[in-house]
Amino acid sequence: MQRLLLIVVLAWPMLAQQSAPAIAFTSVPNYPNLPDGMNFGEVPGVAVNSQGHVFVFSRSNSATGPAFGAAAAQLFEFDQNGNYVREIGKGLYAWSEAHSVRIDKDGNIWAIDKGSNMIVKFNPQGRVIWVFGRRQEAADGAEPLEHPDPPLPAVDGLFRQPTDVAWDSQGNTYITDGYVNSRVAKIDKNGDWVKSWGTKGKEPGQFIIPHSIAIDLRDNIYVGDRSNRRIQVFDTDGNFKRMFTIDVQPDPASRAVNGVTPTGERLKSVIGQPNAMCITPGPNQVLFVGESTFPGRVFKVALDGKVLGVIGRSGRNLGQFSGAHALACPSDHEVYVAETSNWRVQKLLLH
């Protein structure tokens, strides 16, 4: 293990100041087709099923208009042409603060709610079939996100601000548990807790906000360790295999959408932060990685960590991004980007 870690550490300087070509792409205008009077809030989640239907998890609330905190989650479905189909789980008990949505190989819809600490599995018809975690009682305080200091110890079977979900070839489920517990949880195909790994920290196998997760055809598990600015790779037992970072300098003309544009050490700390990830299907898989709010780009990355290309930059306009919080990639030339700061989903066609 010491030899492996030494190799990894020595490899990191070689990744500094990476260069990568810009990838030509088109962002489909006016996507998706929203019904009259309907708007998204912040959009932290997007997923695509095998029929090409797109699922959007929005921080919004139809009952009370603009929503924050304890009532900010709606799950929408659109068809393959971007037309509105339905809202799933309207008024669901688990809804508090939307964070991620994913579709498994059987078409089941998994929604991760950061505010309620819950993960909900719907069947393709939209019926709740599994629930993981538990939210605070209705009589508890209205503020869903509490941060006791020091944090309470992690508890098997429960979550604290979970972030994302993925599956291996054997039907096991992996959940990044996330802002507080700093770990990955493994659940078997029957829904039973198997194990977890990780604690808060900077060493290999530790995390500071494991924010995204994806699994390749060989059951390698990629965890976006956001605040450590790296992607760690594990086997299905949680054994550390390797890690890599993305260090492509932004366009000097780029400006942050919200707040002051980072410079100096602050800029170094946010370049390549893996806010979002997806892996394409098929035999020649690639990884797409969405950066945090700034510099706000999307990267095409080989599974060994080599950056193959850069998509877009920070901004408000079509083809620009801010808060690329989730990605869906049904192919290596079609990518969906969910943005929190820009309150939208973009459908990208890569050339």
Question: Whereabouts are the PLM-identified features?
Answer:
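Bacterial N-terminal signal peptides
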Residues: 3-13
